């Protein structure tokens, strides 16, 4: 059945084989899911916690529909275009692109078939001239404001992407798709892309301050535990310490000068062969004694363990037998992870 309907606290829109679901998800927040499949899925991995019970105000009329949760209002046109407003001030926060027919424009949401029953997904929003975007994890371009940038939604060495952005217009936006993709924060449009995903899934919140937006975000995704004091201190790392004696000499110098040192990091090539996951005992003859001396100086030790394996490593046969090598395949293959348990057996402590 096409058109609008209310389902509990959710607003549902169906048209042209697309289903869109808007529902309250935490204070002043909405979760939006959309799919070209017959039904929306609830079994997909993600970052959002189950929300506390929230009462939404839903209105359905001939001219469209709306759903309000606290200070966040979403208005949906008869064609399915969504606008988000601050319900207290009336400010338009974010609006999807218009449907332009019949000129071949894809509209605000598009679905292109991919392998495995998934879709290449795109969601398009209109730009705001003086809007600024912050967040998105750890990027390497050196910019505070991401406006005008194209950001990969994937991890690389030195790049840790979190698909959550805070806008200067007073909203936060989480792209809730565990898929490789990108976001284009352009001057002509804002475009979110998932290369292969089951459905569109995002979460939006509004706040009077950045702190309130972040508070809504952590309420929705989970609060991190409080860090111990040493974790917030000074960390010393070098590429690389070649021996136990070299590392201890650095820590002793800090101690002699009265400089506070919280953590010292033992990075790569402290092993004999890559994948052995234990120290090279010729250069690191007494790891346990080293750690005791460091802890007596108030210094914690972090050891970098790499998941790559030399074919000559003592762990190579067991990894091969367990099917642990990654390979390009269109089929889902079982994989057993042995790195952590093997490292523990090597007694990194």
Regions found by a protein language model. Give the residues of each.
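N-terminal accessory segment at the very beginning of proteins
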Residues: 1-231, 237-239, 243-252, 263-269, ...
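Short capping/connector residues at structural and topological boundaries
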Residues: 53-54, 282-284, 330, 342
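Short, solvent-exposed polar/charged micro-motifs at secondary-structure junctions
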Residues: 184, 242-243, 274-275, 312-315
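Catalytic cores of extracellular degradative/oxidative enzymes
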Residues: 250-257, 275-296, 314-315, 333
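A structural motif
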Residues: 259-261
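Short, basic, glycine/proline-bearing loop/turn elements
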Residues: 271-278, 346-349
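Active-site-adjacent "subsite" loops/lids of carbohydrate-active enzymes
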Residues: 307-349
């Amino acid at each position: 059945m096409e058109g609008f309907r209310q389902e509990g606290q959710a607003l549902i829109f169906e048209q042209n084989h697309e289903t869109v679901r808007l529902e309250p998800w935490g204070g002043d927040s909405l979760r939006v899911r959309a799919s070209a499949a017959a039904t929306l899925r609830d079994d997909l991995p993600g970052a959002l916690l189950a929300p506390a019970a929230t009462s939404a105000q839903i209105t359905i009329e001939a001219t469209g529909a709306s759903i309000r949760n606290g200070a966040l209002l979403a208005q949906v046109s008869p064609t399915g275009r969504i606008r988000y407003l601050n319900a207290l001030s009336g400010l338009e926060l974010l609006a999807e692109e218009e449907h332009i027919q019949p000129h071949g424009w894809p509209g605000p949401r598009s679905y292109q078939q991919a392998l495995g029953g998934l879709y290449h997904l795109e969601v398009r929003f209109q730009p705001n001239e003086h809007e600024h975007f912050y967040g998105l994890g750890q990027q390497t371009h050196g910019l505070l404001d991401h406006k005008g940038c194209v950001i990969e939604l994937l991890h690389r060495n030195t790049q840790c992407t979190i698909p959550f952005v805070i806008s200067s217009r007073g909203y936060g936006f989480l792209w809730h798709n565990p898929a490789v993709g990108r976001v284009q924060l352009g001057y002509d449009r804002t475009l979110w892309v998932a290369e292969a995903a089951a459905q569109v899934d995002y979460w939006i919140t509004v706040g009077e301050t950045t702190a309130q937006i972040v508070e809504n975000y952590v309420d929705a995704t989970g609060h991190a535990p409080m860090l111990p004091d040493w974790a917030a201190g000074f960390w010393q790392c070098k590429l690389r310490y070649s021996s136990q004696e070299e590392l201890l000499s650095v820590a002793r110098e800090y101690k002699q000068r009265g400089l506070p040192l919280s953590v010292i990091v033992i990075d790569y090539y402290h092993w004999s062969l890559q994948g052995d996951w234990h120290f090279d005992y010729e250069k690191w003859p007494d790891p346990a004694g080293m750690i005791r001396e460091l802890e007596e100086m108030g210094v914690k030790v972090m050891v970098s363990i790499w998941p790559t394996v030399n074919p000559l490593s003592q762990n190579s046969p067991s990894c091969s037998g367990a099917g642990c090598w990654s390979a390009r395949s269109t089929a889902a293959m079982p994989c057993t992870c042995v790195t952590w348990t093997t490292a523990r057996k090597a007694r990194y402590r």
